[in-house]
């Protein structure tokens, strides 16, 4: 589960390009919170702080307690606009979390893909899904889904039905899908082919 990040923001009442530029000159970033049937709230954040957190892994799935004028709101980042040269955060969209569950796009980490059995036999680890869409309990949103693929053999597919998700999470789609495959390069042998050749050599 993601740790809850604590951030402070200030409400803002001036809008438009000129107001946004003035905020950025003052070292602050314009942002907005919307969703859950609520009236959108325009805020500003401290630029260095939000940029620091954005550069950490999986910021877009980070659960945040956002304090605005002494009131706390549970939010999730939705979209981040960056400066095209410096990669400093220029604007952030957040969504309010009021429901018990939230649809999330979460990164997939394939642990041990370089050491997978099929790769050792000359295969190529092909990533089909780098992110998956989950329905998660808002208090149990994972930063990522980590899958150990070290025992994955040649010519096989890793399917969603075989993935154990964190408690409180499920795939949005009920239809089975493929996350990754190990495909053979020319000259690579599957386990069965290797055993057959070894048996023939021993005759």
From Swiss-Prot:
Q: What is the superkingdom listed in this entry's lineage?
A: Bacteria
A Gene Ontology biological process in which this protein takes part is:
translation
Cite the SUPFAM superfamilies for this sequence. Answer: Ribosomal protein L25-like (SSF50715)
Q: Which InterPro entries match?
A: Rbsml_bL25/Gln-tRNA_synth_N (IPR020056), Ribosomal_bL25/Gln-tRNA_synth (IPR011035), Ribosomal_bL25_b-dom (IPR020057), Ribosomal_bL25_C (IPR037121), Ribosomal_bL25_long (IPR001021), Ribosomal_bL25_short (IPR020055), Ribosomal_L25_dom (IPR029751), Ribosomal_uL5_bac-type (IPR020930)
Q: Which UniProt keywords apply?
A: Ribonucleoprotein, Ribosomal protein, RNA-binding, rRNA-binding
UniProt key word Glycosyltransferase: no
Q: Quote one Gene Ontology molecular function term.
A: structural constituent of ribosome
Q: What assembly does the database describe for this protein?
A: Part of the 50S ribosomal subunit; part of the 5S rRNA/L5/L18/L25 subcomplex. Contacts the 5S rRNA. Binds to the 5S rRNA independently of L5 and L18.
Which NCBIfam families does the protein's record reference? bL25_bact_ctc (TIGR00731), PRK05618.1-2 (NF004128), PRK05943.1 (NF004612)
HAMAP family assigned: Ribosomal_bL25, Ribosomal_bL25_CTC
The similarity annotation says:
Belongs to the bacterial ribosomal protein bL25 family. CTC subfamily.
Q: What functional role does this protein have?
A: This is one of the proteins that binds to the 5S RNA in the ribosome where it forms part of the central protuberance.
The name this protein goes by in its record: Large ribosomal subunit protein bL25
Q: Which source organism does the UniProt entry give?
A: Rickettsia africae (strain ESF-5)
Q: What is the lineage of its organism?
A: Bacteria, Pseudomonadati, Pseudomonadota, Alphaproteobacteria, Rickettsiales
Give the encoding gene's name: rplY
């Amino acid at each position: 589960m993601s740790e809850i990040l604590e951030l402070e923001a200030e409400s803002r009442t001036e809008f438009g390009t000129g107001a946004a530029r003035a905020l950025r000159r003052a070292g602050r970033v314009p942002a907005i919170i919307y969703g859950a049937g609520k009236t959108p709230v325009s805020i500003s954040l401290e630029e260095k702080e939000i940029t620091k957190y954005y550069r950490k892994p999986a910021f877009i799935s980070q659960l945040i307690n956002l304090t605005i004028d002494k009131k706390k709101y549970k939010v999730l980042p939705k979209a981040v606009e960056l400066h095209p040269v410096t990669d400093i955060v220029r604007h952030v969209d957040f969504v309010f979390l009021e429901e018990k569950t939230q649809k999330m796009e979460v990164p997939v980490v394939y642990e041990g893909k370089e050491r997978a059995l099929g790769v050792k036999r000359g295969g190529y680890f092909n990533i089909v899904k780098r992110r998956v869409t989950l329905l998660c309990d808002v208090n149990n949103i994972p930063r990522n889904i980590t899958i150990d693929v070290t025992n994955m053999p040649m010519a096989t597919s890793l399917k969603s039905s075989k993935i154990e998700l964190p408690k409180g999470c499920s795939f949005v789609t009920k239809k089975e899908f493929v996350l990754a495959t190990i495909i053979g390069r020319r000259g690579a042998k599957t386990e069965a082919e290797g055993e057959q050749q070894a048996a023939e050599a021993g005759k």
